[in-house]
């Protein structure tokens, strides 16, 4: 009985958290914001998976992230599993990075990047 209770606790504990977000920054999770996103995810023990349309990426790999091309206004699902999953998800909800608001600002040499909130929560499936 003790073994089955332990297995049940381990199984329940291995649940994940996931949320859907809209990317707010332009041009999306490209070079620097993408790199900062990956570094943030790597600073936690939990695994991170990002889903965009029918594509999936490892949130701790910049190359994997680039392959799914997460652009501004894309809807992404972030799935986190591990001991610190809730802490990391909370951090990502509030994450800010140096970026542009839109393409016009990006193309305008007179406009510099500013600190912006990267994501908007679309649905909360914790």
State where each predicted segment sits.
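Short amphipathic
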Residues: 15-25
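Short, low-order "capping/linker" segments at domain edges
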Residues: 110-126
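C-terminal structural segments of small proteins and small subunits
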Residues: 79-111
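Glycine/charge-rich, flexible interdomain linkers and switch-proximal surface loops
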Residues: 57-60, 108-114
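Beta-strand secondary-structure signal
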Residues: 18-20, 75-79
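Short, Lys/Arg-enriched N-terminal segments with co-localized hydrophobic residues
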Residues: 1-14
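Amphipathic alpha-helical interaction surfaces in cytosolic regulatory modules
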Residues: 27-47, 55-74, 86-90
């Amino acid at each position: 009985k003790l073994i089955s209770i332990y297995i049940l606790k381990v199984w329940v504990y291995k649940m994940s958290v996931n949320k859907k977000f809209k990317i707010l920054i332009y041009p999306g999770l490209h070079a620097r914001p993408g790199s900062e996103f990956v570094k943030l995810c790597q600073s936690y023990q939990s695994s991170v998976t990002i889903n965009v349309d029918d594509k999936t990426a490892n949130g701790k790999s910049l190359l994997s992230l680039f392959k799914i091309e997460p652009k501004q206004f894309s809807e992404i699902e972030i799935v986190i599993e591990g001991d610190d999953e809730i802490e990391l998800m909370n951090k990502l909800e509030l994450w800010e990075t140096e970026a542009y608001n839109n393409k016009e600002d990006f193309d305008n040499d007179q406009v510099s990047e500013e600190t912006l909130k990267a994501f908007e929560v679309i649905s909360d499936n914790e």
